Amino acid sequence: MPSVIVVGGQWGDEGKGSIVAYLSLHDEPEIIARGGVGTNAGHSVVINGKKYAVRQIPTGFMQTKARLLIGAGVLVDPEVFFHELEQLKDFNVKDRVGIDYRCAIIEEKHKQLDRTNGYLHGKIGTTGSGCGPANADRVMRKAKQAKDVKELEPYLTDVAQEINDALDEGSLVLVEGTQGFGLSLYYGTYPYVTSKDVTASSVAADVGIGPTRVDEVIVVFKSFPTRVGAGPFPTEMPMEEADRLGLVEYGTVTGRRRRVGWFDFEMARYSARINGATMLAVTMLDKYDKEAFGVTDYDKLPRKAKEFIEEIEERVGVPVGLIKTGPELEHIIDRRDTI
């Protein structure tokens, strides 16, 4: 069985969480792991009308047979971690989650610095979660590791070993990235970026998967890309236009209103190329065409929506295998068997 990596193709908030949640329930992976930066990314999913938002634990938590892992490359905030354990107690997360003992720790001093530093919080528009300062300490070899926090001892493991053992046994491993290509420290709109690279290759390294062991890379795009905070946004639309179209969203972590733009085909093609996309997922198609809401059969999509998907495939050069048509888990078109 393969390893599958899911990453964002825009500026985050593409709906990676909903894609990971669907794959978790439909494909039943034995392991669901989180790579990426840390608690500055909030992934949300709607289950039976109830919205769950997580910043630390993998979004596939509702797959109660899966082992949930947080890779060594991810920053861990113990306060957020234990809050989510309590929040998700109905899903028996506590007995299934593991943290790599090498994860760096976000401390209160990191959060305070992130929130009070005029450059980070004011100009760059960081989330204030402490990830940037914590990663800076990690680079300087000053950060604490998960193995140094007594309260985390029951959850410590070697994530890389667990994942590679699972792959050796033919198990399916699903890996969830954070943020999006436009926020990559290397390839994004520097300096308005996050504190590390978040492309598929880095997400694989975060959890200990070597390049030759990556089987599939799914890059997620939202029909109307959004961005929180400062930074270039070439296809941004006026807020009045976003209001008129009903495209009003707020960040999961910051609560700040998201800036909205038109789909950027040039960026999407470059993002898919650098990430090595084998397949695309498109979310919120119902926002592009309201008549697409809740459709689960590709052949039943209205013409406007179908032409948009076909244009993405043609201009990006990668097939679209998953299409979200609404907020609920079942609001999805799965074309993977036909592309």
From Swiss-Prot:
A GO term for molecular function: magnesium ion binding
GO cellular component: cytoplasm
Record's keyword annotation contains Ligase: yes
Main localization of the protein described in the UniProt heading: cytoplasm
Cofactors (names): Mg(2+)
Enzymatic reactions: IMP + L-aspartate + GTP = N(6)-(1,2-dicarboxyethyl)-AMP + GDP + phosphate + 2 H(+)
Binding residue positions for Mg(2+): 13, 42
GO BP annotation list: 'de novo' AMP biosynthetic process; IMP metabolic process
Active site positions: 13, 43
Location relative to the cell: Cytoplasm
Entry-linked CDD domains: AdSS
Key words of the record: Cytoplasm, GTP-binding, Ligase, Magnesium, Metal-binding, Nucleotide-binding, Purine biosynthesis
Co-factor binding comment: Binds 1 Mg(2+) ion per subunit.
Chain sites annotated for binding GTP: 12-18, 42-44, 258, 284-286, 324-326
NCBIfam families, A to Z: PRK04293.1
Family recorded in the similarity comment: Belongs to the adenylosuccinate synthetase family.
Stated role: Plays an important role in the de novo pathway of purine nucleotide biosynthesis. Catalyzes the first committed step in the biosynthesis of AMP from IMP.
PANTHER family in UniProt: ADENYLOSUCCINATE SYNTHETASE
Protein name stated in the entry: Adenylosuccinate synthetase
Species name: Pyrococcus horikoshii (strain ATCC 700860 / DSM 12428 / JCM 9974 / NBRC 100139 / OT-3)
Organism classification: Archaea, Methanobacteriati, Methanobacteriota, Thermococci, Thermococcales
Recorded name of the encoding gene: purA
